[in-house]
């Protein structure tokens, strides 16, 4: 099961770039959205969602 609740409260579009719309989850795991929001420290398993947007710097 996807640990991210974006599918219930918003949308996460992953690909070459990542966009989160109305994303209210506190963390974006790779299964939902591999991108780290601006100002988020890169990490292995995911990163903290800050705000409602993601930039193109992604966690690997």
From Swiss-Prot:
Residues 29-60 are annotated as: Alpha. The gene is mta. The lineage of its organism: Eukaryota, Metazoa, Chordata, Craniata, Vertebrata. This is Metallothionein A. A divalent metal cation 5 binds at residues 33, 35-36, 49. It comes from the Eukaryota. Signal peptide: none annotated. A divalent metal cation 3 binds at residues 14, 18, 23, 28. A divalent metal cation 1 binds at residues 4, 6, 20, 23. InterPro entries: Metalthion_dom_sf (IPR017854), Metalthion_dom_sf_vert (IPR023587), Metalthion_vert (IPR000006), Metalthion_vert_metal_BS (IPR018064). A divalent metal cation 2 binds at residues 6, 12, 14, 25. A divalent metal cation 7 binds at residues 49, 54, 58-59. Residues 1-28 are annotated as: Beta. A divalent metal cation 4 binds at residues 32-33, 43, 47. It holds the Pfam family Metallothio. Belongs to the metallothionein superfamily. Type 1 family.
């Amino acid at each position: 099961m996807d640990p991210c609740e974006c599918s219930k409260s918003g949308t996460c579009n992953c690909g070459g770039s990542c966009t989160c719309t109305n994303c209210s989850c506190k963390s974006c795991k790779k299964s939902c959205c591999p991108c780290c929001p601006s100002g988020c420290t890169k990490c292995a398993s995911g990163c903290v969602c800050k705000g409602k947007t993601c930039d193109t710097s992604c966690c690997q």
